[in-house]
Amino acid sequence: MSNKNVNVRKSQEITFCLLAGILMFMAMVVAGRAEAGVALGATRVIYPAGQKQVQLAVTNNDENSTYLIQSWVENADGVKDGRFIVTPPLFAMKGKKENTLRILDATNNQLPQDRESLFWMNVKAIPSMDKSKLTENTLQLAIISRIKLYYRPAKLALPPDQAAEKLRFRRSANSLTLINPTPYYLTVTELNAGTRVLENALVPPMGESAVKLPSDAGSNITYRTINDYGALTPKMTGVME
């Protein structure tokens, strides 16, 4: 190999390392700003049918920063959806302050009444620009917090805290199908087949979801789910059908 090719290769490796370092640094900065800045009061929103509104707390933990807060709801496909209205949709939030978002039901009872429906609650925090730094090269990052919003009909056949234990499993080729016979969405985590750790899964009500399954995975299943409060349920066991 010529010296020219060696130099080109070394230059490419250095460039790659620099880019990787920059991306890692930016990720750390974003994570730090997200933790120190705007936070939501819940990891998911449950909207009981028939209720006029539900509330979601928003807190600015950064004493020295003001954020513009923009909020909206999307459907399960990630498309903005007017069936739920967030108010106020846009407001400024000073440091060390808390505000409350009100989510209003505008579905007119058009959603299924025998199972939950999934939406996404979005809260974007846009940092204000420091006027003293307008002449400098600065990077302003808007952080979007996105959490699940479940519309829950009244009088479902099964209490929500009993849904996780009803989950069933079926093996087919190189995948494991999770079967949910309940009217609730199930967020499955810490899913194991024998000693193999599998992917997390969101299983729709009265539906199923598949995850990759290694060929040497065992038939004994253990898993946990996330409850209405964002906490993990106790570990459960299941057997492949």
From Swiss-Prot:
- Signal peptide start and end residues: 1-36
Q: Name one GO biological process term.
A: chaperone-mediated protein folding
Q: Kindly give the Pfam families that the UniProt entry links to this protein.
A: PapD_C (PF02753), PapD_N (PF00345)
The subcellular location is: Periplasm
Q: Does the keyword Chaperone apply?
A: yes
- Keyword annotations from UniProtKB, A to Z: Chaperone, Fimbrium biogenesis, Immunoglobulin domain, Periplasm, Signal
Q: What InterPro entries does the record tag this protein with?
A: Ig-like_fold, PapD-like_sf, Periplasmic_pilus_chap, Pili_assmbl_chap_C_dom_sf, Pili_assmbl_chaperone_bac, Pili_assmbl_chaperone_C, Pili_assmbl_chaperone_CS, Pili_assmbl_chaperone_N
Query: Which is a Gene Ontology cellular component entry for this protein?
Result: outer membrane-bounded periplasmic space
Q: What does this protein do?
A: Required for the biogenesis of type 1 fimbriae. Binds and interact with FimH.
Q: What's this protein's family per the entry? A: Belongs to the periplasmic pilus chaperone family.
Q: What is this protein called?
A: Chaperone protein FimC
Q: Which organism is it from?
A: Escherichia coli O6:H1 (strain CFT073 / ATCC 700928 / UPEC)
Report which gene this protein is encoded by. Answer: fimC
